[in-house]
Amino acid sequence: MVKQLKFSEDARQAMLRGVDQLANAVKVTIGPKGRNVVLDKEFTAPLITNDGVTIAKEIELEDPYENMGAKLVQEVANKTNEIAGDGTTTATVLAQAMIQEGLKNVTSGANPVGLRQGIDKAVKVAVEALHENSQKVENKNEIAQVGAISAADEEIGRYISEATEKVGNDGVITIITIEESNRLNTELELGMQFDRGYQSPYMVTDSDKMVAELERPYILVTDKKISSFQDILPLLEQVVQSNRPILIVADEVEGDALTNIVLNRMRGTFTAVAVKAPGFGDRRKAMLEDLAILTGAQVITDDLGLDLKDASIDMLGTASKVEVTKDNTTVVDGDGDENSIDARVSQLKSQIEETESDFDREKLQERLAKLAGGVAVIKVGAASETELKERKLRIEDALNSTRAAVEEGIVAGGGTALVNVYQKVSENEAEGDIETGVNIVLKALTAPVRQIAENAGLEGSVIVERLKNAEPGVGFNGATNEWVNMLRRGIVDPTKVTRSALQHAASVAAMFLTTEAVVASIPEKNNDQPNMGGMPGMM
């Protein structure tokens, strides 16, 4: 395919147009008075959302150079979402501000490499200051506040807080899943999660979220390595007749077996998801036994003289639902015998009391939390399918925010935390282009507050200047147009979300500014010839 090139200023300006188009579509959603964006869906009803990463993913521009600029900002949103689960709109606003300000300086003759050094230096200081200002999440109310701010809905914050309280939040495990329902409520169901994901992305059932969701699946539990498809074919034939999906938990599924599972999944013959067994060595065997007891399965192992070729469907476990991501597998409401589960829990508690090894005790406590902690299910209801999708997205963001808050604490919300570190960053000693790079970050730190104010119908510059001179923690409440102590009022953001947004925005901005040439494919022209007209008198 023939390529075309642009260099220097031409290249950067073309990409900037793409950055601005995407960022302008996303930033209207930031803050309590942010608006929604309607996304056209080819085969379903339009999706109405204010989720930054969802909007960013939908944007594809006709001009290849503009599209590359948009894709760079998409990467900011995706990375922030991947690490922190929220804050994608903030990251987009920060990236646009840094790119716009940086490009002005490059056009004026600044050296992009020096600017990059200054940006990196300023962001490092800002992140350290954010951690210094961070406060731990200590109670149910603070979790509810984080969820409510993220979802812009106090009711959602309350339900997430209740769900977190039900599963416990001791730092070992917090499992909450979201299901569709006719009303909003939370339930605690028996289940477990382990840190192993699907062995092939072709196994997913939802390509948008890259998740495999299995309803009422059979569960095969084995410590064997499955290489030959023939070894599991008799068992899979029985599963196919039942018209139910299957989760295969094994030492590893590889070669011919993995290939055939993927091919049959793509053809629609059956739905199967293969994941590696959790843990290692003796601990792996114990965790497989935990899973088998929870789901009512029989572990297929040489220790019991069992072979995969002889396995029957009654050796499989079952559960009401299984959700598999690229990193984790969550089993909800296994059909194991309650007495057997209680006996296993008692056994684990006894082992925890008897062991003298701190490491073994920690691992046993993890297993106990997985087995006895349960899975909180938030059931989401709405009046229409469009509203349901939008509400699920908001709850997912809020849930990710609360997890991030538990990990690294909270800071003042509404963009206040970024302006609070302004003074610390400005004290950085630097010269020349490095100093200019620091100033680029300083201006960007005020961008989220500025946009929140503008979305509320106010002059952003006035709000920013007043905030710079306010006491630490005091900020602008965009919902009421009041100046309040953000932490006391419960207007908070997870430190991890704010930090990730700033770091990823700076990373992409630095790459953008140091770009000197852009190579793009030339779109192929449509060479279809027009139809020939008929001869006179011909039909």
From Swiss-Prot:
Pfam families to which the protein is assigned, alphabetical: Cpn60_TCP1
One GO biological process term: protein refolding
Gene3D superfamilies on file: GroEL, GroEL-like equatorial domain, TCP-1-like chaperonin intermediate domain
Domain of life where this protein originates: Bacteria
Disulfide bridges in this chain: none
Keyword Isomerase in record: yes
GO molecular function terms listed in the Swiss-Prot or TrEMBL record: ATP binding; ATP-dependent protein folding chaperone; isomerase activity; unfolded protein binding
Compartment annotation: Cytoplasm
Induction: By heat shock.
Keyword terms of this UniProt record: ATP-binding, Chaperone, Cytoplasm, Isomerase, Nucleotide-binding, Stress response
Keyword Cytoplasm: yes
Catalytic activity: ATP + H2O + a folded polypeptide = ADP + phosphate + an unfolded polypeptide
Binding site for ATP: T29, I30, G31, P32, D86, G87, T88, T89, T90, G414, D493
Function: Together with its co-chaperonin GroES, plays an essential role in assisting protein folding. The GroEL-GroES system forms a nano-cage that allows encapsulation of the non-native substrate proteins and provides a physical environment optimized to promote and accelerate protein folding.
Family: Belongs to the chaperonin (HSP60) family.
Oligomer and partners: Forms a cylinder of 14 subunits composed of two heptameric rings stacked back-to-back. Interacts with the co-chaperonin GroES.
Protein name, UniProt field: Chaperonin GroEL
Protein species of origin: Staphylococcus aureus
Gene name, Swiss-Prot/TrEMBL: groEL
